Design a protein with these regions (language model features):
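Juxtamembrane/disordered regions of integral membrane proteins
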Residues: 1-144
């Protein structure tokens, strides 16, 4: 993997990073909404807010958010890397770094603090972008 940034199609890298961050954010909200809806039906009414807040800040929900961030980063990194013929791994890695910056900004804006779980999300976003680029690079090498 060479670090020649002139071969990267930057528009697709930015689009891939935005797709990765938005996908992670929307899927996390969908999981939280689905959980609240199920609990609302089980309790036959509006669930207590304290119970929902306690569930959403619990460790399993945070881990689900990190996994969803990884999935979004892989998709965004692969999307950015598919357009780069010369260096798909670098395009995926840069898309992952940009997605990590967006995830960091969203987490800091939502929670107001940067904690260990935010650091884990950022690391997973960078690694997910790199994996997406590697998958796209492997696909382009086998198709030649």
């Amino acid at each position: 993997m060479s670090f020649d940034f002139s071969t990267i199609k930057w528009s697709w890298v930015v689009i891939g990073a935005i797709v990765a961050a938005v996908l992670a954010f929307v899927l996390t909200l969908a999981v939280q909404f689905g959980y609240g809806l199920v609990i609302g039906f089980q309790l036959r009414g509006t669930p207590p807010q304290e119970m929902l807040i306690e569930a959403f800040i619990s460790t399993p929900f945070i881990i689900v958010g990190i996994v969803i961030t990884a999935i979004g980063a892989v998709i965004g990194g692969r999307m950015a890397a598919r357009r780069s013929e010369d260096n798909p791994q670098l395009a995926g890695l840069v898309a992952g770094v940009l997605a990590a910056a967006l995830v960091l900004a969203l987490r800091a804006w939502q929670w107001g603090v940067v904690d260990v779980w935010t650091l884990a999300s950022v690391i997973v976003a960078v690694l997910g972008g790199w994996v997406g680029g590697r998958l796209a690079g492997r696909r382009s090498q086998t198709s030649l």
